[in-house]
Amino acid sequence: MPSRELARRGRFDTLDAMRALALVILSVMASTAAADPCTEELSARHVAWKKASRSGIANAVEITGPLGGVTVSAVDHALVIDCSLAVSLAEAGRYFVALGIDHVNFSSAYSRRNVRGTNRPSKHSYGLAIDVHTFTGPELGSLRIDRDYEQGLGDTVDCVGAPLTQGGAVLKVLQCQLVRSGLFHLVLSPDYDDAHHDHFHLEVKPWGDRPELRSTTQAIH
């Protein structure tokens, strides 16, 4: 067989081998993605999402629909967070809905920055935290943390205390519910410090460090 023909066949054999290898790699990637336990949990909650990529986020997802019946949005950017936080928000949706809330506005989710006054990266840097500030519903109207949250209420026996306004009561009940649900590692409010005067900071642990996936706590309202 002429050497030119042998060379041509050799190139074809190499291309076939490369195609076969590419198919194997794609198959492995697809099976790995399908087996991801966090996104499986997210899909099981009927959340619309798509895979995303952000520096620092271990399992980034972009949320494209409601979370547990609640739309979570910002004015100028999409909600891209770690899947672990997305599952918590979806699971917590029923607590918002029980209080008449169907829309939540956030001011910050994924953001590369340090904890105020330190050199330690904030959990926002990993997509594991979100700051929510406005809550709306068809009967509720619009509630804002900086305007309607009543500080200094409740104690270790009675978390809610005695709010003076309906808006204050809704926000305090929501805070207590989110704390007692166990779905969030941290829930910080204006009672924590002045830096949180206008929002609730909700933070979770990475998926592999979480002891529970669901909350069995009943909604209080």
Where are these regions (language model features)?
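Sec-dependent signal peptide recognition
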Residues: 18-24
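N-terminal signal peptide c-region/cleavage motif recognized by signal peptidases
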Residues: 30-32
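Active-site acidic/histidine clusters and adjacent loop/turn architecture
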Residues: 36-107, 111
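Catalytic cores and adjacent binding grooves of peptidoglycan-active enzymes
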Residues: 39, 49-64, 121, 126-221
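Conserved short secondary-structure elements within globular domains
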Residues: 94-121, 173-189
